[in-house]
């Protein structure tokens, strides 16, 4: 079985997990951007009361 035949028969088994991993990577990068914005946002700049949980989880 050549490499070309192997790729032709199993391309779904390669691309679907690769797409999932790439999507997870992009999601984490987007979360980092949103976290950086949240830390600069006037809405979340106030001090939390005692025993108050953060609203962004």
From Swiss-Prot:
Positions in coiled-coil regions: none
Name of one Pfam family that matches: NADH_oxidored
Keyword annotations of the record: Electron transport, Membrane, Mitochondrion, Mitochondrion inner membrane, Respiratory chain, Transmembrane, Transmembrane helix, Transport
GO biological process: aerobic respiration; proton motive force-driven mitochondrial ATP synthesis
Location in or out of the cell: Mitochondrion inner membrane
InterPro entries on file: NDUB1 (IPR012575)
Transmembrane segments: 10-26
Membrane topology value: Single-pass membrane protein
Subunit annotation: Complex I is composed of 45 different subunits.
Family listed: Belongs to the complex I NDUFB1 subunit family.
Role noted for this protein: Accessory subunit of the mitochondrial membrane respiratory chain NADH dehydrogenase (Complex I) that is believed not to be involved in catalysis. Complex I functions in the transfer of electrons from NADH to the respiratory chain. The immediate electron acceptor for the enzyme is believed to be ubiquinone.
Name of this chain's protein: NADH dehydrogenase [ubiquinone] 1 beta subcomplex subunit 1
